[in-house]
């Protein structure tokens, strides 16, 4: 941006999740950023120079903590607005913001974990399982079982702490977006992918998400193993279907078969960006149940009558569906989420056999390019030597 518009004096970065403890100076332009999730406020003081440009005098990030006393007038306004949340929004879904959905004793992974740890995480497990539960237990369920549900890290905004899980907390955990209905929250969408494309979903997580961490994928129904040391786009060594929570046996994926996939609208729209990142090598086309490509993903929103099934509402329903194990009339989050279930297994091996087993077409393409480059280098060396000999002989 600075290169395109050098006359800008100050760029306040947003949506990058980057905390800059000191401004970045690029020519006469300063770039600042407070970080993410409202954890800091930033203050900056600048003095104008004789040439019209500006110098930074002071710059400080101020952590937002409970120790900061709220402004009374502002807090009063916020409280009045919060009172409308129940009547103007949550009433559409039969909830109130302070309603307790479940009691939680599980230590769930954090949002930061989703970006920093490339493995199965229980926060992703419970969210993806919630998608399956909400669809298959809706009064509008059409009887078509969900084979796979997918949740990317890029949509998750908060975790679930120990104690009471309220509607407000669940909404905050998945608060992004808006649907075609004009109501806040991304809806769930229903689509179909071939078995070959399901394997590519696993490969996107294994190969692409280290460069594009919003594409870390957490699946219900799709289990896979990957080796981070293998060639890019050929890191997945095993991929198969398994019912949520391990019910039933392993099911091998048929490349040409259509599988029912549920995800949120954001994820569907994100596929284009992922394919661009892979330069078209990873191509996934969402389809209807007859195998026809879907032109508008918004039209695939899962509807309950005239209302979209929102992703956050799916999670809320799942939370309150758990058994009441302590008899106090409130659901308890299942102990199932206290451990991993081989949904995403990391095979951290440098063994030569592990590095080359199960090659796919991408490894063949990349290997072919590598060999071609080596051949061209050899030919270039031979050509240079030949030219040098001719020069010496002359």
Where do the protein language model's features map onto the residues?
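Active-site-proximal segments of metal-dependent phosphoesterases and phosphodiesterases across multiple
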Residues: 1-13, 118-119
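Short, flexible, glycine/charge-rich loop motifs used to bind or transfer phosphoryl groups or to couple energy/partner
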Residues: 1, 21, 249
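Loop/turn elements at helix/coil->beta-strand transitions in domains of secreted/extracellular proteins
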Residues: 6-9, 27-29, 144-146, 257-259
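Short, surface-exposed basic-aromatic patches at helix termini and helix-loop junctions that form
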Residues: 1-6, 24-28, 49
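Catalytic centers of hydrolytic enzymes
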Residues: 35-394
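Active-site environment of divalent metal-dependent phosphoester hydrolases
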Residues: 10-25, 38-42, 157-158
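Short hydrophobic/aromatic-enriched beta-strand-loop microsegments
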Residues: 30-34
């Amino acid at each position: 941006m600075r290169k395109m518009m050098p006359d800008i004096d100050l760029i306040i970065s947003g949506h990058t999740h980057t905390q800059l403890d000191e401004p970045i100076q690029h020519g006469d332009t300063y770039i600042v950023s407070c970080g993410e999730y409202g954890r800091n406020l930033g203050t900056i003081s600048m003095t104008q120079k004789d040439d019209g440009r500006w110098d930074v005098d002071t710059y400080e990030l101020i952590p937002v903590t409970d120790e900061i006393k709220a402004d009374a007038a502002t807090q009063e306004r916020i409280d009045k607005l919060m009172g409308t949340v129940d009547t103007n929004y949550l009433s559409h879904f039969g909830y109130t913001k302070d309603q307790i959905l479940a009691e939680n004793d599980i230590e769930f992974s954090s949002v930061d974990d989703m970006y920093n740890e490339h493995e199965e995480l229980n926060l992703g497990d419970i969210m993806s399982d919630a998608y399956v539960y909400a669809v298959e237990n809706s009064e509008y369920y059409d009887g078509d079982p969900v084979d796979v549900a997918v949740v990317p890290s890029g949509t998750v905004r908060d975790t679930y702490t120990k104690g009471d899980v309220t509607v407000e907390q669940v909404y905050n955990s998945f608060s992004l977006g808006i649907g075609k209905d004009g109501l806040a929250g991304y809806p769930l969408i229903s689509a179909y992918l071939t078995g070959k494309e399901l394997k590519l979903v696993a490969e996107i997580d294994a190969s692409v998400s280290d460069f594009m961490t919003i594409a870390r994928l957490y699946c219900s129904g799709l289990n896979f193993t990957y080796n981070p040391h293998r060639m890019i786009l050929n890191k997945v060594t095993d991929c198969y279907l398994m019912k949520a929570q391990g019910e039933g046996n392993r099911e091998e994926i048929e490349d040409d078969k259509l599988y029912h996939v549920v995800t949120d609208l954001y994820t569907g729209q994100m596929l284009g960006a992922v394919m661009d990142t892979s330069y078209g090598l990873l191509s996934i086309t969402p389809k209807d149940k007859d195998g026809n490509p879907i032109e508008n993903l918004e039209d695939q929103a899962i509807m309950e009558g005239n209302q979209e099934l929102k992703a956050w509402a799916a999670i809320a329903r799942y939370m309150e569906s758990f058994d009441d194990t302590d008899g106090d009339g409130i659901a308890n989050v299942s102990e199932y989420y206290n451990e991993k279930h081989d949904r995403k297994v990391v095979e951290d091996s440098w063994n030569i056999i592990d590095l080359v087993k199960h090659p796919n077409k991408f490894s063949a393409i990349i290997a072919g390019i590598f060999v071609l480059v080596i051949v061209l280098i050899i030919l270039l060396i031979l050509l240079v030597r030949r030219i040098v000999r001719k020069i010496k002989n002359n």
